[in-house]
């Protein structure tokens, strides 16, 4: 009996979060269907979970950004500059595709906005003005109010200043970031319980139409990711290697993407990508740097998730968005996506930063994060699959282009 109890506790603490979230999702749907009155009473679980996310997210962004900048070391000289350019291009194009998809298929979300205060900007000038005001905000107020633009500004400034600090100071900051990340991991472990409360209460109050909205949102997200994987990325690779990119694209999706889909971790998929690069006889000095770098900053999937969910919230609140503001959202989403690997909740906990552009309160933004967690069983897997397969795809494209250039130069010299 004691052994079974220990096994159950181990499963709760160390078991697959995807499976646990799926169980919470199904349990919430069943409770709302069988006992709607009871389902409404468990809404406290969802409220507590969203509150915990709202409390930890500002501190997480601040300490992680500051730590990563303070502990940055100058990289060794390799051929990663063209790969880095492809990473940046791919991430930006992913944000553009997501924004375009959200405009073509605008989707509302079921959010509790009755008591929330909103101050939507009127145009791009107001957005930029608001961003500049938030940049120079008091850092304590920025943390208290969830002003992510101000948090980023202070974290970057302090990180740059601390690059000249003693190694012991940098080590302390790194340890602090690890500690905060551990706290976030604990909060995320409660996601199944929180989602159980959120789903059951939402369906009990709004009916099963709320689930249909989640399915539609998931379809838009996955469609944008498929467009990136099968259309935009091949075009980028073709621009680099000047020949049919699809054999390479499908090889990367098959060998790297499928594994990443189930591991749901770009970092965990690094050995898979390294082994694939080795089998393709790519330059070891290049892929040994570009693959870990890609796991950190190449976040096409995150660049899709952030604007799709942000614009879904914007549509729900009836905030008008013009083309310049949409382009600015693409840039902000691409920048946010590059930092998604350092966040335990992935891209979802960076959604409030994008939402702040439109005057959406932190309270509503965290409800959007909760919606993201509900669909996260598939969304996070697809996002990681796109992220990780693109790492090896762009690395292979640059290495092959470099080999072609060297071969061409040798032929020219012989002639």
Swiss-Prot record:
GO CC field: plasma membrane
Pfam family, one: SDF
Subcellular location, record wording: Cell inner membrane
GO molecular function, one term: neutral L-amino acid:sodium symporter activity
InterPro entries: Na-dicarboxylate_symporter, Na:dicarbo_symporter_sf, Ser_Thr_transp_SstT
Gene Ontology annotations of biological process type: serine transport; threonine transport
Membrane topology: Multi-pass membrane protein
Main location: membrane
Transmembrane segments: 15-35, 45-65, 85-105, 142-162, 193-213, 217-237, 301-321, 331-351
Domain of life: Bacteria
Keywords on record: Amino-acid transport, Cell inner membrane, Cell membrane, Membrane, Symport, Transmembrane, Transmembrane helix, Transport
Reaction catalyzed: L-serine(in) + Na(+)(in) = L-serine(out) + Na(+)(out); L-threonine(in) + Na(+)(in) = L-threonine(out) + Na(+)(out)
NCBIfam families named in the record: PRK13628.1
Family note: Belongs to the dicarboxylate/amino acid:cation symporter (DAACS) (TC 2.A.23) family.
Biological function: Involved in the import of serine and threonine into the cell, with the concomitant import of sodium (symport system).
Protein name: Serine/threonine transporter SstT
Organism listed in the record: Photorhabdus laumondii subsp. laumondii (strain DSM 15139 / CIP 105565 / TT01) (Photorhabdus luminescens subsp. laumondii)
Gene name linked to the record: sstT
